[in-house]
């Protein structure tokens, strides 16, 4: 009887039996990482990264500029980036759009691309 009481007490006091939980890790934001992402597919290996101090999830959308000056979507790069800011870079042959987010897990998946 005493053994059952002790076992019950151990199971009540140790709800995460065999696992160590860090309360900070439970609130980490996760992001996708892919060097070349296009139309819902990662050409390579899709991995995850967790945000560290001053980091955000980032999507870099690469566009090719046509002779008429229009942008044609080419591919995206997904990553965790330090000191990330939303910005557009415009060159003679390409445009790069950088979009940053840190509001939810895996928020850096491009929509409508």
Curated annotation (Swiss-Prot):
Residue stretches in coiled coil: none
UPAR/Ly6 domain mapped to chain residues: 29-110
Location(s), subcellular: Secreted
GO CC annotations on file: extracellular space
Signal sequence, renumbered to the chain: 1-26
Disulfide bridge partners, by residue number: 31-57, 34-42, 49-80, 84-101
PANTHER family xrefs: PROSTATE AND TESTIS EXPRESSED PROTEIN 2
Similarity remark: Belongs to the PATE family.
Record's protein name: Prostate and testis expressed protein 2
Underlying gene: PATE2
């Amino acid at each position: 009887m005493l053994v059952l009481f002790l076992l019950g007490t151990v199971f009540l006091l140790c709800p995460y039996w065999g696992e160590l939980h860090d309360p900070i890790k439970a609130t980490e934001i996760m992001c996708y990482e892919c060097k070349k992402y296009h139309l819902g597919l990662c050409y390579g290996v899709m991995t995850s990264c967790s945000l560290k101090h001053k980091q955000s999830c980032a999507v870099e959308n690469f566009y090719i500029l046509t002779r008429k000056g229009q942008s044609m979507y080419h591919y995206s790069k997904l990553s965790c980036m330090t000191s990330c800011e939303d910005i557009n870079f415009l060159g003679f042959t390409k445009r790069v759009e950088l979009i940053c987010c840190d509001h939810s897990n895996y928020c850096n998946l491009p929509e409508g691309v």
